[in-house]
């Protein structure tokens, strides 16, 4: 048996062990492998990264080499393309396809290539001759091709490094961005330039080429560049060689002590502002698209250079390289062209021997000297301009008019005649002047050219010029001199390279192809441009400015001091612009235009006129200080007057009138500021204290409408109200209440034009308003905790709104409906008054209550609607009964709250918490009210509705009548034993005496809560009792609150009953309101008899509503009868009547009328109802009948007065109501004794009567308890109409079932835990809630 097991164990155990060990080993190995991989991964990734970096570097290097080769091949491609076309032009046609710039390397290279192709020679130029040969080559080519040499040098960003042409063209090593410095620089190098930094110009046409980024001197001296050249005149070569050798001897810095006649810089000097003479044929069929593209880029950049000149950074670098820049001058007629150097004793003249400075100065007397730097150029005066127009210029291209020929500027003495042969080119080609036709250029030059001279002695310190011009147009003296001579930068303020300190703060516009220096130049150019376009400059103004400028210049040889130069700047003008900046963005132009306008206003116009006037008003003449507008020091700030605008033709002229302006001293501004601050502080302090000036208070009154008037501001003293009424007094605006300090009055007098204004402050609320607000918040909080609908607590603030009405408004009111906005805090008519008109209708007027209900329905759920109410419902605060009005307001609010509770429902928890909270204090107030009720008559109740804690005691006469009624009821009870037909009326009479004794005095106080609990068809709505009825048209129960039967017959009796009801439960009626009711009371009296033909059972039902709260606490649990029929068979009309009058206070009877009515009712009840004997035959019915009579005895007399007979249904309803109160009476007997122990002797007598009447009812109660299950089931299964009508006459058995049903019902109601009492008016609950009194 065990052998297989052991075998398996012996075999499996080792396998298990070894297998586990193997698995563990595998796991360990896997973990180690993973760890190793993780540790080695960074090393491998690092190696890969290094490899990628190295590979990327190699790729970048190869890419750079490839690109450099491509760039170097571009000129070769250009040449190859030209060669492939098979084009062999004539010598004079070579430059037709190229620009006229003699120093453009690309064009020169192309021209040389073409020249060599034509000649077939390949010559290499040595290093010493490369520079001059280049210049000579350019000059020769231009002379043979009739092209002008008055062009500037510019280089392009797309220039190649190491431009290697064919054997004819030497390598142009690193040609990009080279600048023209001096002819000796031609020996040097075209050093490295910034690849993407497009070339800038020769400073007004000097052909000295220097790279943007310069190499060291050694590199410059040792660099070799082979320059192309054409066959040159040997004479020119020999004349230029000495200067080149001189420039190369031991010069680490490139100096300019050489003659530039071969390059004719003077010619370029004066021509640069107007001369970019590009002669292009109309059609270039031999050029390929690529060549055309390159040429187009070249031309565009050259034009841009011509417009904007050399960037500031390039000029600064050149200044470092050339410490002694040359000077140029415009020669007179037939005078030699010289190149003058500052601080240099010798001047080398081309083709002439060296002469001294004095000799040169004598030769050039009266001629302007031009500086080397573009930023320091000056313009010509009118005379010199006229003189220059008469000077022939053979080297320049013949232009359509002598004006443009004069613009060609200085000219050389040699080779001039050779260029005359090229004048025929002007007939074939158009000359482009900065992209404009020649005619346009001519007109601009002839019209606007003007200039200004400069000192001509080299030792004279040359102040920076204040009125330079833009490169593509002439200019007048500058408009905005922004720097002083002492602090001027090397470049002129208005030069393209100059930027004022304020300009650095301007918004930088992102123009992709412009550098910072270019943008700065553009910005200033646009400043000039905007002025010229917007305002223009008439010829008369220009001539006057030119004359002024001419008078400011001195002849040659006389030094001009810096002061004189500074004084000469007073004549200010702007430059004339000639073309639009098509490449400039529109948004940039707009921004610049705005900036220009702002700058003009700030620099030329000063502060706005209004500000100046306001400052002057604050100061006297002695406190003003006149400051010269010409001063720019910070201590002497000047504010020039606005520039006058004069219209001359179609142009607006800016006449800069620099008149002295008065400006306040700083300490005066400080004083004014301190005065204003102190004034504001004092005002704020007074306002915080609640003291408002009369003018401010009056403005508040004006802003508040009369309908919504508010109580006077409490902080204004009564003695000052007279000032508030003097609105017509003009001085009242500036008056201040006596509590204001005197200094403030003086301050206001010092500033008569000012009116003190204060921000709106929250008005101080009265104590009553604060209390109402607090109450509103509490109600909202309770509504939130109890889960009430929003409409409930939304309506509460309206109910809390005070009836604040000024007496003036009250006197103006007319007896007509008034629309009142439903605002939460301020209302003319309080919401409580609206509740009165919508509340109980004691007259029994179904239609009137229904109409009012219809008006009220939209007002409750809809917030902010207009509610139209009759004027009768408004509360008059001027009523003499102030206490009555206050009480009435509270009761109306409570009534309104109860209406809302009935309509929308209150949760059970809210009711329980309310009962527990109010039970103890209300018990005390109720007991006090019971004592007071015994000593006061019914007349006071009719005059004014009084709250429960101040209800007066009933009249002793009424007590006597009640006792008499009790005796009569006892007699009736004895007669009932003898005859069953008379038993019920007698028992009812006896019941009246029994119940009226303990609680007859409390009828007025507890009637409202009975009315509230009368809804039969809504057993779930179990709200606490309150001093108000249900709101009309909200409950659909036809038998909710029936009307009194007495209101249906006699109008006189109706009025009497209405008076009783107003005294009992109409708490919302004030004395003033009762005086206005006669007209309204007459209407329901005539209508009720037709509306309620059958009202006996409704009368008994309404009496049941009035009864429970009037009597002992035993009645309250049976206030609500879920099993009451909604309709009675055979009484459809009465059902409709019940629907119309379900929320009215129908049963409100005075104690004085009870005995009289009881005496008249009893015989009618016994005579007119023969069928009543059947229900009363049963033994247990006797006690119950007595209970029913007790319930209905109080109200039955009134019904008997109105209607002589009782119907069958009314009697059965009385029995039903009696059965509802049997069980609580027996249980709460002890409570009844304790509650009425504090009453007067009359109350004790009533207790004895009640005890006697309750004795026969004990046995029925016990029997009803034993039959609870069957009675309850029958009560639940029976229809509601069986309780009333002919079906109730079946026999004693059915009556017994009914009795059992009613005896069972109180227990079920109490089991449900729904309270049936009003803590405010029903003393039962207050006593029951005390310790030792279980509920």
Swiss-Prot record:
InterPro entries: SPATA31, SPATA31F3-like
Keywords (A to Z) from UniProt: Membrane, Transmembrane, Transmembrane helix
Organism superkingdom: Eukaryota
Chain segments carrying region Disordered: 403-424, 480-502, 972-1002, 1019-1141, 1248-1335
Signal peptide: none
Transmembrane segments: 8-28
Recorded topology in the membrane: Single-pass membrane protein
Compositional bias per record (Basic and acidic residues), positions renumbered to this chain: 1047-1064, 1071-1083, 1129-1139
Compartments, record wording: Membrane
Any one GO CC term of the record: membrane
Biased composition (Polar residues): 414-424, 972-1000
Disulfide cross-links: none
Family indicated by similarity: Belongs to the SPATA31 family.
Name of the protein described by the UniProt record: Protein SPATA31F1
Organism from which the protein derives: Homo sapiens
Lineage: Eukaryota, Metazoa, Chordata, Craniata, Vertebrata
Gene (UniProt): SPATA31F1
């Amino acid at each position: 048996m065990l052998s297989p097991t052991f075998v398996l164990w012996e075999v499996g155990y080792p396998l298990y062990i070894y297998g586990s060990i193997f698995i563990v080993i595998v796991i360990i190995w896997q973990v180690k492998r993973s760890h190793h991989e993780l540790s080695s991964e960074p090393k491998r990734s690092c190696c890969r990264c290094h490899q990628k970096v190295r590979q990327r570097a190699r790729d970048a290097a190869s890419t750079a080499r490839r690109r450099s080769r491509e760039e170097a091949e571009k000129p070769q491609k250009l040449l190859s393309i030209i060669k492939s076309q098979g084009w062999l032009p004539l010598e004079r046609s070579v430059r037709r396809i190229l620009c006229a710039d003699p120093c453009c390397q690309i064009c020169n290279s192309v021209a040389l290539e073409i020249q060599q192709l034509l000649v077939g020679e390949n010559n290499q130029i040595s290093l010493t001759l490369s520079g001059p040969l280049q210049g000579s080559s350019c000059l020769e080519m231009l002379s043979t091709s009739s092209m002008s040499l008055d062009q500037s040098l510019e280089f392009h960003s797309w220039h190649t490094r190491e431009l290697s042409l064919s054997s004819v063209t030497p390598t142009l090593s690193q040609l990009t961005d080279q600048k023209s410095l001096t002819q000796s620089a031609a020996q040097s190098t075209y050093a490295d330039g910034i690849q993407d930094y497009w070339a800038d110009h020769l400073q007004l046409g000097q052909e000295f080429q220097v790279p943007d980024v310069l190499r060291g001197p050694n590199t410059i001296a040792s660099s070799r560049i082979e320059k192309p050249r054409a066959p040159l005149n040997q004479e020119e070569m020999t004349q230029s060689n000495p200067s080149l050798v001189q420039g190369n001897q031991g010069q680490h810095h490139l100096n300019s002590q050489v003659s530039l006649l071969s390059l004719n810089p003077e010619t370029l000097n004066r021509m640069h502002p107007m001369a970019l003479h590009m002669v292009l044929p109309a059609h270039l069929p031999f050029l390929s698209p690529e060549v055309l593209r390159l040429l187009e880029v070249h031309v565009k950049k050259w034009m841009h250079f011509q417009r904007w000149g050399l960037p500031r950074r390039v000029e600064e670098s050149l200044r470092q390289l050339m410490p002694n820049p040359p000077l140029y001058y415009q020669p007179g007629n037939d005078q030699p062209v010289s190149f003058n150097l500052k601080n240099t004793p010798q001047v080398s003249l081309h083709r002439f021997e060296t002469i001294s400075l004095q000799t040169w100065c004598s030769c050039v007397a009266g001629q302007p000297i031009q500086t080397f730097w573009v930023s320091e150029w000056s313009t010509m005066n009118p005379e010199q301009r006229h003189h220059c127009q008469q000077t022939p210029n053979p080297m320049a291209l013949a232009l359509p008019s002598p004006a443009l020929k004069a613009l060609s500027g200085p000219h050389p003495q040699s080779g001039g005649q050779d260029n005359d042969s090229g004048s025929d080119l002007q007939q074939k080609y158009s000359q482009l002047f900065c992209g404009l036709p020649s005619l346009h250029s001519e007109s601009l030059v002839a019209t606007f050219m003007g200039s200004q001279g400069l000192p001509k002695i080299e030792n004279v310190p040359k102040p920076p010029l204040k009125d330079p011009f833009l490169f593509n147009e002439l200019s007048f003296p500058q408009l905005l001199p922004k720097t002083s001579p002492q602090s001027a930068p090397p470049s002129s303020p208005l030069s393209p390279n100059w930027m004022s300190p304020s300009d650095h703060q301007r918004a930088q516009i992102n123009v992709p192809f412009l550098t910072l220096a270019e943008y700065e130049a553009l910005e200033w150019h646009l400043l000039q441009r905007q002025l010229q376009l917007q305002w223009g400059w008439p010829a008369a103004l220009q001539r006057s400015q030119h004359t002024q400028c001419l008078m400011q210049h001195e002849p040659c040889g006389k030094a001009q001091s810096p002061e004189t130069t500074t004084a000469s700047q007073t004549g200010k003008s702007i430059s004339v612009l000639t073309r639009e900046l098509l490449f400039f963005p529109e948004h940039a132009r707009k921004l610049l235009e705005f900036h220009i306008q702002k700058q003009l206003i700030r620099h030329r116009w000063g502060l706005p006129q209004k500000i100046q006037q306001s400052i002057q008003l604050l100061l006297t003449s002695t406190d003003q200080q006149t400051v010269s507008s010409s001063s720019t020091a910070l201590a002497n700030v000047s504010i020039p007057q606005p520039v006058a605008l004069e219209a001359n033709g179609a142009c607006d002229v800016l006449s800069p009138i620099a008149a002295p302006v008065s400006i306040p001293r700083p300490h005066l501004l400080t004083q004014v500021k301190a005065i204003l601050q102190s004034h504001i502080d004092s005002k704020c302090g007074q306002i915080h204290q609640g003291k408002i000036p009369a003018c401010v208070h009056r403005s508040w009154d004006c802003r508040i409408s009369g309908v919504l008037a508010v109580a006077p501001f409490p902080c204004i003293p009564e003695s000052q109200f007279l000032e508030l009424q003097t609105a017509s007094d003009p001085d009242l605006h500036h008056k201040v209440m006596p509590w204001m300090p005197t200094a403030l009055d003086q301050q206001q007098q010092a500033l008569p034009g000012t009116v003190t204004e204060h921000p709106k402050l929250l008005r101080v609320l009265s104590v009553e308003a604060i209390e109402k607000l607090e109450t509103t918040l509490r109600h909202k909080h309770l509504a939130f905790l109890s889960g009430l609908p929003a409409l409930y607590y939304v309506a509460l603030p309206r109910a809390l709104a005070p009836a604040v009405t000024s007496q003036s408004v009250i006197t103006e009111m007319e007896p007509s409906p008034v629309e009142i906005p439903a605002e939460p805090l301020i209302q003319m008519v309080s919401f409580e008054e609206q509740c009165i008109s919508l509340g109980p209708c004691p007259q029994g007027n179904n239609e009137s209550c229904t109409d009012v209900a219809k008006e009220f329905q939209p007002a409750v759920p809809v917030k902010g609607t207009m509610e139209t109410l009759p004027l009768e419902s408004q509360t008059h605060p001027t009523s003499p009964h102030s206490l009555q009005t206050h009480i009435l307001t509270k009761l109306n609010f409570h009534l309104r709250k109860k209406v809302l509770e009935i309509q929308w429902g209150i949760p059970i928890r809210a009711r329980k918490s309310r009962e527990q909270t109010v039970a103890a204090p209300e018990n005390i107030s109720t007991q006090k009210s019971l004592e007071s009720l015994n000593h006061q008559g019914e007349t006071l109740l009719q005059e004014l509705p009084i709250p429960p804690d101040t209800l007066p005691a009933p009249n002793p006469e009424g007590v006597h009548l009640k006792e008499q009624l009790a005796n009569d009821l006892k007699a009736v009870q004895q007669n009932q034993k003898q005859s069953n037909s008379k038993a019920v009326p007698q028992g009812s009479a006896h019941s009246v005496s029994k119940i009226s004794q303990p609680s007859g005095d409390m009828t007025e106080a507890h009637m409202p809560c009975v009315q509230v609990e009368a809804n039969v068809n809504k057993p779930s709505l179990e709200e606490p009792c309150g001093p108000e009825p249900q709101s009309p048209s909200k409950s659909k129960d036809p038998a909710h609150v029936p009307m009194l039967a007495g209101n249906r017959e006699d109008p006189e009796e109706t009025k009497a009953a209405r008076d009783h009801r107003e005294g009992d439960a109409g708490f919302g009626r004030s004395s003033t309101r009762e005086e206005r009711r006669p007209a309204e009371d007459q209407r329901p009296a005539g209508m009720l008899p037709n509306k309620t033909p059958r009202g006996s059972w409704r009368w008994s039902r309404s009496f049941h509503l009035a009864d429970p709260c009037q009597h002992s606490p035993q009645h309250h649990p049976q206030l609500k009868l879920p099993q009451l029929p909604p309709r009675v068979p055979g009484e459809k009309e009465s059902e409709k009547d019940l629907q119309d009058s379900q929320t009215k206070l129908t049963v409100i009877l005075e104690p004085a009328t009870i005995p009289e009515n009881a005496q008249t009712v009893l015989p009618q009840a016994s005579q007119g109802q023969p069928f009543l004997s059947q229900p009363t035959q049963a033994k247990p019915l006797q006690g119950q009948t007595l209970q029913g009579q007790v319930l209905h005895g109080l109200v039955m007399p009134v019904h008997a007065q109105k209607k002589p007979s009782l119907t069958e249904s009314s009697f059965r309803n009385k029995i039903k109501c009696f059965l509802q109160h049997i069980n609580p009476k027996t249980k709460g007997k002890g409570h009844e004794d304790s509650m009425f122990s504090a009453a007067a002797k009359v109350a004790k007598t009533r207790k004895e009567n009640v005890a006697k009447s309750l004795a026969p009812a004990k046995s029925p109660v016990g029997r009803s308890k034993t039959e609870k299950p069957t009675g309850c089931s029958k009560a639940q299964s029976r229809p509601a109409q069986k309780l009333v009508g002919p079906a109730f006459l079946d026999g004693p058995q059915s009556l017994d079932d009914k009795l059992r049903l009613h005896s069972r019902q109180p227990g079920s109601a109490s089991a449900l835990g729904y309270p049936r009492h009003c803590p405010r008016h029903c003393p039962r609950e207050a006593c029951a809630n005390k310790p030792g009194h279980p509920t």
